[in-house]
Amino acid sequence: MAQKDNFAGGFLLGTVIGGVVGGILGSVLANRAATQSPDREKLDTEGVGNLDSEENIELARRRLEDKIAQLNLVIDDVRDQLGHVNELNNIKEVQEEHR
């Protein structure tokens, strides 16, 4: 019976944590997608055909660097959140062992 209680508690905790992480990740990505960089606006207004190949390469490189930076920020946020969850789980395990 105790295993079923632990499973249910763990399942609910995982659901809550997954929802929080997913919500934060979704809101961060949606916020970043809503803001456009000047390079994207330049491409939207002038079109890709009006730029020479060096400018196209430079714009693509900058966009790629921006996306990598965004992904790194999100990864760091999730890593921090999971670290806090692991700390809480370790504290609970220690408390249960001392009972």
Swiss-Prot record:
Coiled-coil spans in chain: 50-84
PANTHER family per the UniProt record, alphabetical: LOW-DENSITY RECEPTOR-LIKE PROTEIN (PTHR34048:SF3)
Organism of provenance: Synechocystis sp. (strain ATCC 27184 / PCC 6803 / Kazusa)
CC terms in the record's Gene Ontology section: plasma membrane-derived thylakoid membrane
Keywords: Coiled coil, Membrane, Thylakoid, Transmembrane, Transmembrane helix
Listed InterPro entries: Ssl2009-like (IPR040377)
Protein name from the UniProt record: Thylakoid membrane protein ssl2009
Spans traversing the lipid bilayer: 10-30
Compartment annotation: Cellular thylakoid membrane
Membrane topology annotation: Single-pass membrane protein
